[in-house]
């Protein structure tokens, strides 16, 4: 797919799925902005990608003033945005009995408020016919123990994306959702013990974890003209996790 000259904004683009997607868009010719909370991680990402078409923005999109920093960086470039990939996210897994207000607020601020207001602030900067893609998760549908807050954030994102697809349709802006299953990323490593990875792999029909590059390819497809009649849809990229029945 060719994205030469297209302008792409990716939140949470310094590691994992965001980084893999930034690489894919750069390789397809796009100009890419990535955000992250850590300047160090953004520097590492920039060195790894090593392209003049990449710009990094230190911004925690859970904070509205920092969304304004991203908006300013985009507007100063003088170009409208063709693709907005709302990907930043965090997770902690605890039973409802043990969850804290801090757990709740952190995940909803990053996973829901951040996406909502980043979209809101960047809508005026989207070209007509742009593509907006949300990173959700199979947990929005699944009912795994210990995931109540994280799952709730992803369920909320799905509804926001579906309504946005209707609200922005008059400008031919398509809004879609990519919902990964268990994917090998630094984020996954940070929230589950090593022995749990084998369990997650066994819970998929393909009997393995996904790769961030596989999610990136789906994002590029949804952002491309090949998906021009896809709007308000959720794409499960989960190796059969949701529908797999263990034998």
Q: Over which residues does each language-model region extend?
A:
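Substrate-binding pocket helix/loop in short-chain dehydrogenase/reductase
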Residues: 95-96, 100-108, 188, 200
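A conserved structural motif in NAD(P)-dependent oxidoreductases
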Residues: 204-215, 226
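Active-site helix of classical SDR
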Residues: 119, 153, 161
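Conserved glycine-rich cofactor-binding loop
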Residues: 7, 14-16
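Active-site loop-to-helix junction immediately N-terminal to the catalytic Tyr of the SDR YXXXK motif
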Residues: 99, 143-151, 163, 246
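Alpha-helical segment proximal to the catalytic Tyr-Lys
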Residues: 124, 166-170, 228
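Short C-terminal tail/terminal secondary-structure segment
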Residues: 220, 231-247
């Amino acid at each position: 797919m060719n994205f030469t000259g297209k302008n792409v904004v990716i939140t949470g683009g310094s590691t994992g799925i965001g980084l893999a997607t930034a690489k894919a868009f750069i390789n397809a010719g796009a100009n890419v902005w990535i955000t992250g909370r850590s300047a160090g991680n953004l520097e590492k990402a920039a060195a790894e990608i090593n392209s003049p078409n990449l710009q990094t923005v230190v911004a925690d999109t859970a904070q509205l003033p920092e969304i304004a920093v991203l908006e300013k960086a985009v507007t100063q470039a003088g170009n409208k945005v063709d693709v907005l990939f709302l990907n930043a996210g965090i997770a902690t897994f605890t039973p409802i009995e043990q969850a804290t207000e801090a757990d709740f607020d952190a995940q909803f601020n990053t996973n829901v408020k951040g996406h909502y207001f980043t979209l809101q602030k960047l809508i005026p900067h989207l070209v007509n016919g742009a593509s907006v893609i949300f990173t959700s998760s199979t947990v929005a549908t699944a009912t795994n123990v210990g995931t109540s807050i994280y799952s709730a954030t992803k369920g909320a994102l799905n509804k926001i994306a579906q309504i946005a697809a209707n609200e922005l349709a008059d400008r031919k802006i398509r809004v879609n959702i990519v919902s990964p299953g268990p994917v090998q990323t630094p984020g996954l490593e940070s929230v589950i013990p090593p022995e749990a990875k084998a369990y997650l792999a066994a819970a998929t029909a393909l009997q393995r974890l996904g790769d961030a590059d596989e999610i990136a390819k789906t994002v590029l497809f949804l952002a491309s003209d090949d998906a021009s009649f896809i709007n308000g849809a959720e794409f499960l990229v989960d190796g059969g996790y949701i529908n797999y029945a263990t034998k």
